[in-house]
Amino acid sequence: MARRPRHSIYSSDEDDEDIEMCDHDYDGLLPKSGKRHLGKTRWTREEDEKLKKLVEQNGTDDWKVIANYLPNRTDVQCQHRWQKVLNPELIKGPWTKEEDQRVIELVQKYGPKRWSVIAKHLKGRIGKQCRERWHNHLNPEVKKTSWTEEEDRIIYQAHKRLGNRWAEIAKLLPGRTDNAIKNHWNSTMRRKVEQEGYLQESSKASQPAVTTSFQKNSHLMGFTHAPPSAQLPPAGQPSVNSDYPYYHISEAQNVSSHVPYPVALHVNIVNVPQPAAAAIQRHYNDEDPEKEKRIKELELLLMSTENELKGQQALPTQNHTCSYPGWHSTTIADHTRPHGDSAPVSCLEEHHSTPSLPADPGSLPEESASPARCMIFHQSTILDNVKNLLEFAETLQFIDSFLNTSNNHENLDLEMPSLTSTPLNGHKLTVTTPFHRDQTVKIQKENTIFRTPAIKRSILEGSPRTPTPFKHALTAQEIKYGPLKMLPQTPSHLVEDLQDEIKQESDESGIVAEFQENGQPLLKKIKQEVESPTDKAGNFFCSNHWEGDSLNTQLFTQASPVADMPNILTSSVLMTPVSEDEDNVLKAFTVPKSRSLASPLQPCNGAWESASCGKTDDQMTASGQSRKYVNAFSTRTLVM
């Protein structure tokens, strides 16, 4: 048989002995030829008889020789069949107290993993028998009590989600083995669940009633948790399930004011108390077997929300909205209902005092805490009302930041749901305001949130873009000096080209170019500065790019660093006349000339030289002692 996963600490499987054996399993299919079906069928009576004879003739030392006489059987299969089924010395009866005590002692010595070693100390028992005996009976952590209803419920829900993966289910029930859970399900629970409806009614009662029709939750609603004594508006009746304390306002209830900025928000942000957060966790935890069904219903609700907002160009409210800080009824058109009917829903009634929270937050239905119940509200009304409620300080902060964001982020919560461990497949529709917005439905592809965004071709093929400051500088340059000219590169005549450019700019600006300083050309002086020992990078640049074919003279003359102290940035050749405003700016970047040395170098003082160079009496004595100590040893080669 195929191997089963071994993840539970109470698993009764072992990697070296997984094949279940029976004394006479001769009812299986006949062996099939081919490597694919090698050893996949049960042993026949003829194969067992032949294996017994071969063991009597050849012994149990070389199973490969025996396997040669049994087609479609390997040496390992022959060995396991003999040791676990056909061996006459194998004990298949009940375990004695002495054997149980021996197993306990050996497990304490070798641990609950080395079953082959443990089996060698028990004559007539194999490792699989010892393992199953320990996990099913002798392990002190294994529960031997009767099954409780809570354990049955866990098994029922886990089996609906995982199927016959008993090792995974055993992780949810500490103290129960996968084999015990499997036996309990097959012998008792499956019949009671399938035929008698066991645990099905209690499971439905414990789960929130979100399996209602699409008509009930496919609309935007402004609602609150109404106490049981609240009166429902006469215009309509509650929809499918009376557990919901909110009702839809019929389209006949017309109110006159105008809501300028309708925004879709999650209802639980506004009027769901904090204790209801636990209900949300129970709604959407990973163990919920109806999670997929809930997701589909939320997708349908989002589709309805989009259609309703598209149909609403102006959402009226009552005339005294600005004077009253509370909530008011709004007329919401539902275009998604198949028969045109409108299920009534109650909104918050008008009050001239601060609205009071429900007395019993725990009585709030779990359905009202769903993050997909949305509502339309007035911006100023929301801010004025929420500021009066200290219990909703966090709500105020969220709404204020939400309403002040750009229109591009109004549908952030609906377009970007929280990531789950499994990508959700569905069409998420955007919810936008009906004012100055494109009403085109935006459909997301499957698992779009987990995919790398596509790069536009224009970005890949476009030319490099010039930064804005450079654009302004180039524009000013073109206005002042004319359009830029692209000249061919002439590396061999670089010096001549630079001299021409400097001379041309100097002539245009009215300044005579000074090409000679102390009888030395300026460019040669520049190259000497770059060749200075303080700038090795300039040395590399000049040696590679300033060597011209036409330069036949020695360009790099030996010059002292003091002679090159004036900086080329202060030279008048490179400075063009500028206006007074520009001159003030450029002065900040002008490097001042280096100050010359005040006086020539003077000889050091004798006392200072003796102290700094180690010529004092103490230093001379220490140096002499060190030399004597070192000279006492012979010269040795340093071995690394």
From Swiss-Prot:
It holds the Pfam family LMSTEN. CDD domains: SANT. Interacts with HIPK1, HIPK2, MAF and NLK. Its main location: nucleus. It comes from Bos taurus. PANTHER family: MYB PROTEIN-RELATED (PTHR45614), MYB-LIKE DNA-BINDING PROTEIN BAS1 (PTHR45614:SF51). Residues 90-193 are annotated as: Interaction with HIPK2 and NLK. PROSITE patterns: HTH_MYB (PS51294). The modification Phosphoserine is found at S532. This is Transcriptional activator Myb. Transcriptional activator; DNA-binding protein that specifically recognize the sequence 5'-YAAC[GT]G-3'. Plays an important role in the control of proliferation and differentiation of hematopoietic progenitor cells. There is a cross-link at K480 (Glycyl lysine isopeptide (Lys-Gly) (interchain with G-Cter in SUMO2)). The modification N6-acetyllysine is found at K471, K480. SUPFAM superfamilies: Homeodomain-like (SSF46689). Residues 35-86, 87-142, 143-193 form the HTH myb-type domain. Residues 338-368 are annotated as: Disordered. It comes from the Eukaryota. Residues 275-327 are annotated as: Transcriptional activation domain. GO terms for biological process: mitotic cell cycle; positive regulation of transcription by RNA polymerase II. Residues 375-396 are annotated as: Leucine-zipper. SUMOylated by TRAF7; leading to MYB transcriptional activity inhibition. Residues 63-86, 115-138, 166-189 bind DNA. The keyword Transcription regulation applies. The keyword Flavoprotein does not apply.
